[in-house]
Structures are given as C-alpha cells and as structure tokens.
C-alpha cells in the first residue's frame, strides 16, 4: 500500500509518499510545492496540479490522504485554501485514487499522542517513527508525512 499524504495550501503545500510493506512502514519521498503569491490564482493552482501529477506518476500511490481544513476567520484565506483543495481533489479523482481526509487533531494525536501538539513536536516524532525523514525541516512537508503515516497506522485504507 502506497499513500500520498498532502498538507493542502496555496502558498506552500506539503506532500509525502509513505508505503506499508508487510508490517513495515517505509518513507519514500516528500517535498513542498511553493507558489508565488504575485501570480494569478489559476496559474498557482495549475502549478500545484502539474507538480503533484508528477509525484503521482512517479510513485503510483494507491490512495491519497489529505488534511481536513478548518474555516479561518479570514474568509479570503479560507476560500483560497478551498480552491487548492478542490484542485487537488480533482487531480486525485482524475487518477482514480481512493482518498481519506483527516482532522488536524487526529493527525497530531496519532503521531505525537497529543491532539494539540505543536509543529516542532510533529517534526520530531516523524523523524523517530520513519527512518529516512531526518533531513525534513519544513513543517508543511512534515505534516504531509504525518498525514500519510496516520492513514497507514489507523488502517484507514
């Protein structure tokens, strides 16, 4: 089972690919997709899609796991995040991948044991839980690893 974990965002999206081989979890790859806030939103969404599409084609995941979002007090920010999620979900659908969504607190609790963990705690724990993640320093990338990890360890596939 290969999971593509996604921490959705318009400015800095995190992605990660984690596999389960028998009882062993294996980190395969991760990264961030940064877009320029000065670019038109449709160009930013297209860049996110084309970059994630390359990840899907290279790693051939069976499923995508994406973090659910909360409604921010800034409605414009929430709307833009909704655009990004819609574009990502459309790509997931186009490749006929199953998809699971996880609440941020569920991911935090699964990875750290505490549903209100801070970003640095998540980063620390994924480095302990998944060999190969020691070079990750970006919290968006770490969150994507944590989302994929949550999908695999909760057997939500």
From Swiss-Prot:
UniProt binding sites for Mg(2+) 2: 67
GO cellular component: cytoplasm; Holliday junction resolvase complex
Complexes and interactors: Homodimer which binds Holliday junction (HJ) DNA. The HJ becomes 2-fold symmetrical on binding to RuvC with unstacked arms; it has a different conformation from HJ DNA in complex with RuvA. In the full resolvosome a probable DNA-RuvA(4)-RuvB(12)-RuvC(2) complex forms which resolves the HJ.
Annotated family: Belongs to the RuvC family.
HAMAP family for this protein: RuvC (MF_00034)
EC number of this enzyme: 3.1.21.10
Subcellular location: Cytoplasm
Positions bound to Mg(2+) 1: 7, 140
Alphabetical list of InterPro entries matching this protein: RNaseH-like_sf (IPR012337), RNaseH_sf (IPR036397), X-over_junc_endoDNase_Mg_BS (IPR020563), X-over_junc_endoDNase_RuvC (IPR002176)
Residues at the active site: 7, 67, 140
Organism in which the protein naturally occurs: Rickettsia massiliae (strain Mtu5)
Function: The RuvA-RuvB-RuvC complex processes Holliday junction (HJ) DNA during genetic recombination and DNA repair. Endonuclease that resolves HJ intermediates. Cleaves cruciform DNA by making single-stranded nicks across the HJ at symmetrical positions within the homologous arms, yielding a 5'-phosphate and a 3'-hydroxyl group; requires a central core of homology in the junction. The consensus cleavage sequence is 5'-(A/T)TT(C/G)-3'. Cleavage occurs on the 3'-side of the TT dinucleotide at the point of strand exchange.
Cofactor: Mg(2+)
Protein name: Crossover junction endodeoxyribonuclease RuvC
Entry annotated with the keyword Secreted: no
Superkingdom of source: Bacteria
Source organism phylogeny: Bacteria, Pseudomonadati, Pseudomonadota, Alphaproteobacteria, Rickettsiales
Cofactor binding notes: Binds 2 Mg(2+) ion per subunit.
UniProt KW keywords: Cytoplasm, DNA damage, DNA recombination, DNA repair, DNA-binding, Endonuclease, Hydrolase, Magnesium, Metal-binding, Nuclease
GO molecular function, one term: DNA binding
């Amino acid at each position: 089972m290969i999971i593509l974990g996604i921490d959705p965002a318009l400015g800095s999206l995190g992605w990660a690919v984690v596999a389960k081989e028998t009882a062993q979890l294996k980190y395969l790859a991760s990264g961030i997709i940064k877009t320029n806030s000065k670019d038109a939103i449709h160009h930013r969404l297209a860049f996110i899609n084309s970059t994630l599409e390359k990840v899907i084609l290279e790693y051939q995941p069976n499923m995508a796991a994406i973090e659910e979002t909360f409604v921010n007090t800034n409605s414009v920010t929430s709307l833009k995040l909704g655009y990004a999620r819609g574009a990502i979900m459309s790509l997931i659908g186009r490749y006929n991948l199953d998809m699971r969504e996880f609440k941020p607190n569920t991911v935090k609790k699964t990875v750290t044991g505490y549903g209100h963990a801070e970003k640095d705690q998540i980063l620390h724990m994924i480095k302990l839980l998944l060999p190969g993640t020691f070079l990750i320093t970006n919290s968006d990338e770490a969150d994507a690893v944590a989302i994929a990890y949550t999908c695999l360890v909760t057997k939500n596939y």
